[in-house]
Curated annotation (Swiss-Prot):
GO terms for biological process: cell wall macromolecule catabolic process; cell wall organization; peptidoglycan catabolic process. Residues 30-274 are annotated as: Non-LT domain. In the N-terminal section; belongs to the bacterial solute-binding protein 3 family. In the C-terminal section; belongs to the transglycosylase Slt family. It catalyses: Exolytic cleavage of the (1->4)-beta-glycosidic linkage between N-acetylmuramic acid (MurNAc) and N-acetylglucosamine (GlcNAc) residues in peptidoglycan, from either the reducing or the non-reducing ends of the peptidoglycan chains, with concomitant formation of a 1,6-anhydrobond in the MurNAc residue. This is Membrane-bound lytic murein transglycosylase F. One of its GO terms (cellular component) is cell outer membrane. It comes from Saccharophagus degradans (strain 2-40 / ATCC 43961 / DSM 17024). NCBIfam families: PRK10859.1 (NF008112). It comes from the Bacteria. Murein-degrading enzyme that degrades murein glycan strands and insoluble, high-molecular weight murein sacculi, with the concomitant formation of a 1,6-anhydromuramoyl product. Lytic transglycosylases (LTs) play an integral role in the metabolism of the peptidoglycan (PG) sacculus. Their lytic action creates space within the PG sacculus to allow for its expansion as well as for the insertion of various structures such as secretion systems and flagella. GO terms for molecular function: peptidoglycan lytic transglycosylase activity. The lineage of its organism: Bacteria, Pseudomonadati, Pseudomonadota, Gammaproteobacteria, Cellvibrionales.
Amino acid sequence: MTKILLNTASTVLTRLWKLSLLGLVFAVAAATLVSSRIPTTLEEVKSSGKLIVISRNGPTTYYEGPAGHTGFEYVMAKAFAKHLGVDLEVREIEDLGEMLDKVGTKAGHLAASGLTVTEKRARKVLFAEPYLQVTQQLIYRSGESKPETIEDLYGKRVMVISNSSHSERLKELQREYRDLAWEEQHDVDMLDLLEMVHNGKIDYTIVDSNAYQINRPVYPKATVAFDISEPQDLAWAFPQQKDASLYNEAQKFFKDIKQTGAIDDAMETFYGHLGEIDYSGAILFAHRLQSRLPKWETHLKAAAEKNDLDWQLLAALSYQESHWNPKAKSPTGVRGFMMLTLNTAKEVGVKNRLNAEQSIYGGARYFKSLHGRLPERIKEPDRTWLALAAYNIGLGHLEDARILTEHFGGNPDKWADVKQQLPLLAKRKYYKFTKHGYARGWEAVDYVQNIRNFHTIIAWNEIENQRLQQLAQNENHVSDYAQFSPTVTEAVKSISGTSSL
């Protein structure tokens, strides 16, 4: 009996041991499965601490501005990275076809490059919530016969960027208009094509409405003929795969920024009116000499004297920046009377950028610093004009333009030569070889010219202010220009680009 009991106990213990061992095996296996589970893309991004975005360096995507990297796509991608709690890394791929092929690979988690949602592209990638609608616009040269229909393109030289939504649209139109022909180039950008139309090298091109709006001041003869498409969505591109974790998070992100209005602020910053100076703006400046300048004249003179500057030049610079508004604020981050970035304010010791006196003294110190950091061999007045350009576009971009100037046989120390090359910083075939990349170089040229003209008017105003007041009261004058002396009249005309009344 005892033997039977011992055998039974042994059998039970053996079974319990086997069950325990089996349980341990299952536990280890389960732990192994959990530890070996492939993380989602979203988890991978968060654990690595970095979001990699594919884009193109350019005016509607991202570029290096005076305050650092900027551009609509860059700002949105930066906000998404912040939403995820990670850093942003932008990687450039210039060819649009290659860009879409590499979405979701090691090249990048997503593509944010002003991509138009098309049927063909939607078969390759997964598009997120659209953030903007654009139309494709046919561009022709002002002064030439304006095309009214697609048939008007027959026999003409039409050029577009290869692998673009514009080439897709032309292929769609060709099904109905069989005689439609065009050229595709992969080594040109939108600004190149606008220049070709402007100079009459090609008859027509196609650009997106948002891109045209940003760049129309550069080549004013390149004009819209008509919309060649219905409104189309722009969106970010994600890979088509089962793991949609990052895509879903992006959908939540866009929903949030639309509700908070953050996306509207970005739209206004990058796609709002460019602020070209026209006749009315020039006249407004002339009147603000009387209404605003006197309030700040004492501070401007003191700051200029302390930094060995021309106070009238400092006044002209500050008007160009803020219109003498101490509370001026830009969505890009510059603020105050001298529109200082946060980093620049810290550099020159400004604690409150909205304090006009601090801003004036800080702006004067910053301009003096830029003036002094230029090569010693540069003489006046070129030194001042180049320093003004640096205040607008940054020393890095200015140096890029000076290198280009020397490359093309010009004098990098002469403003007259450098200003000819500054617009090249907006053209891919040039800026892709520069250290600091894309910049809206033509704006720096206009910026300096405006300040020089403002300076002329302020200098004249200092001498003949009383006479101007008397002339302004004369009811017999037939135009606003006639309220001022010939000197002021010509300066105002120069600013506004008006040659006759």
